[in-house]
């Protein structure tokens, strides 16, 4: 099998790369990777990435400062990356000559620039699931801008919101994965002959990698057609995107699908047996955690003197060891309501950095060498590695489709 040359953007500590390098056939070759953390003198994530991976070019600068020429000179059959959910609104330039301008600093437009310079066969992107609903004032606009842009560049797109715990992992981490593929590929031609709902339920990439029930949750199904006028979309588009969907030549079908659940790993199964006393909590810290996790009704006053009550429901006193962990955030190193709070054999403590790595499917001590606070921060930013391996296995199958096989193709 031929190698798939991969460019990894916003690489973090290498979750995409690690997942792709663990695939069945191992045909992914990361040729160029970029990681840059703004306003940080020490680039801990980049240093970790460079320590763990020796092959390929590692770029440690603002992606906006990477020239078109440098992008064009990289080998890219596929672009991957997890990028932040930002404001994707667009406007036409005053003279009209520059076409559509995304808001300055929005990293999605840097992905588009990379695509325009390389036109890879595949795209694999990851984002928080609220991308499908943002902004709250114009639901679905941001994702529609993305889809319209990719459609204009000649890509079809499949997407799925995946909760890692639904497919056998130890963390309830919900993210949207977006798979784009050029419309002239054999896979696209095969999908051209398939009804949109069949792609979502049965023979699309995500249907194969993460099986779902063959009916919609509460009959939630939505269709639309998207245009190339992203200024009009930015100004006027509003639409309900569900957790699964496909865009094929501008036609969109989205369905609220139900996973075929796999037995998840529990928090208790990944915790370390011998933990340093430094992760144990004193009584003041224990009391603070219990207060933060408890129900509240607090009287507050606005700047103009208006009084109101802030209410917050209670959580379980500690995180259950019999369930998958909750979603890790970048603030996992601090005492707050979202941080995991454990009672292990009568000892109250937090997660260790190794446990945080295990929840994302990284090898133990992957982030060793950076400050503990940064180890948690990097894991709060990371994705669940085994999900990428499952997706990568399907991309390997897709890439192996030959012209001779196409006429009689029945996918996988």
Curated annotation (Swiss-Prot):
MF terms (GO), sorted A to Z: DNA (cytosine-5-)-methyltransferase activity; DNA binding
Residue runs in coiled coils: none
Keyword DNA-binding assigned: yes
Catalytic site positions: 85
CDD domains: Cyt_C5_DNA_methylase (cd00315)
EC number per UniProt: 2.1.1.37
Catalysed reactions, semicolon-separated: a 2'-deoxycytidine in DNA + S-adenosyl-L-methionine = a 5-methyl-2'-deoxycytidine in DNA + S-adenosyl-L-homocysteine + H(+)
Domain SAM-dependent MTase C5-type: 4-402
Keywords for the protein's UniProt record, in alphabetical order: DNA-binding, Methyltransferase, Restriction system, S-adenosyl-L-methionine, Transferase
Enzyme class: transferase
InterPro entries, alphabetized: C5-MTase, C5_DNA_meth_AS, C5_MeTfrase, C5_meth_CS, SAM-dependent_MTases_sf
Pfam families: DNA_methylase
SUPFAM superfamilies: S-adenosyl-L-methionine-dependent methyltransferases
Superkingdom of origin organism: Bacteria
GO biological process, one term: methylation
Family that this chain belongs to: Belongs to the class I-like SAM-binding methyltransferase superfamily. C5-methyltransferase family.
Protein's UniProt name: Type II methyltransferase M.Sau3AI
UniProt organism field: Staphylococcus aureus
This protein's encoding gene: sau3AIM
């Amino acid at each position: 099998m031929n190698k798939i040359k991969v460019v990894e953007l916003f690489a973090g500590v290498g979750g995409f790369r690690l997942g792709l390098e663990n695939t069945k056939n191992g045909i992914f070759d990361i040729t160029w990777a970029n990681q840059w953390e703004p306003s940080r003198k020490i680039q801990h994530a980049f240093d970790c990435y460079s320590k763990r991976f020796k092959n390929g070019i590692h770029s440690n600068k603002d992606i906006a400062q990477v020239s078109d020429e440098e992008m064009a000179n990289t080998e890219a059959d596929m672009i991957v990356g997890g990028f932040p959910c930002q404001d994707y609104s667009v406007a036409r330039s005053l003279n009209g000559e520059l076409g559509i301008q995304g808001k300055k600093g929005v990293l999605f437009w840097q992905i588009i620039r990379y695509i325009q310079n390389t036109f890879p066969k595949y795209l694999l992107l990851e984002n928080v699931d609220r991308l499908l609903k943002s902004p709250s004032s114009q639901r679905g606009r941001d994702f529609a801008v993305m889809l319209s842009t990719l459609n204009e560049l000649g890509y079809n797109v499949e997407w799925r919101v995946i909760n890692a715990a639904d497919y056998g992992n130890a963390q309830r981490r919900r993210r949207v994965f977006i798979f784009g593929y050029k419309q002239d590929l054999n896979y696209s031609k095969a999908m051209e002959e398939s009804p949109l709902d069949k792609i979502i339920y049965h023979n699309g990439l995500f249907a194969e990698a993460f099986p779902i029930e063959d009916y919609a949750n509460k009959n939630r199904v939505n269709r639309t057609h998207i245009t190339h006028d992203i200024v009009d979309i930015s100004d006027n588009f509003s639409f309900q995107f569900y957790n699964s969907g496909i865009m094929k030549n501008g036609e969109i079908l989205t369905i609220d699908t139900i996973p075929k659940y796999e037995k998840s790993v529990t928090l208790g199964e990944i915790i370390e047996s011998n933990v340093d006393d430094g992760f144990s909590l004193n009584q003041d810290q224990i009391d603070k955690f219990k207060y933060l996790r408890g129900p509240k009704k607090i009287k507050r006053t606005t700047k103009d003197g208006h009084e109101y009550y802030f209410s917050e429901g209670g959580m379980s006193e500690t995180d259950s060891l019999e369930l998958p962990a909750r979603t890790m955030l970048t603030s996992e190193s601090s005492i707050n309501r979202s941080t995991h709070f454990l009672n292990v054999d009568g000892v109250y403590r937090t997660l260790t950095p190794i446990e945080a790595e295990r929840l994302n499917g990284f090898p133990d001590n992957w982030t060793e060498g950076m400050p503990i606070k940064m180890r948690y921060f990097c894991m709060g930013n990371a994705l669940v590695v085994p999900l990428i391996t499952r997706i990568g296995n399907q991309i390997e199958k897709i890439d192996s489709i030959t012209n001779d096989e196409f006429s009689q193709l029945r996918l996988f």
